């Protein structure tokens, strides 16, 4: 869960700094961590 929070924090910070490459990778991190959490919930 902390990785998801960190990825969201990185995305917000990248947007504020207008660092579009970092924003893109942060969004990918959010998706990865979200899928991982859902996988654990549903036993994947």
Swiss-Prot record:
Membrane-traversing stretches? none
One Pfam family here:
PSMbeta
Q: What is its main location?
A: secreted
Is Secreted among this UniProt entry's keywords? yes
Q: List the keywords (alphabetical).
A: Antibiotic, Antimicrobial, Cytolysis, Formylation, Hemolysis, Secreted, Toxin, Virulence
Provide GO CC annotations from the record: extracellular region
The Gene Ontology terms for molecular function here are: toxin activity
Check the record and name the InterPro entries matching this protein. PSMbeta
Keyword Metal-binding attached:
no
In Gene Ontology terms, what is a biological process of this protein? defense response to bacterium
Sites where N-formylmethionine occurs are at 1
- Compartments it resides in: Secreted
What the record says about family reads:
Belongs to the staphylococcal hemolytic protein family.
The protein's job, in short, is: Has hemolytic activity and also inhibits the growth of gonococci.
Protein name (Swiss-Prot/TrEMBL): Antibacterial protein 3
Q: Which organism is it from?
A: Staphylococcus haemolyticus
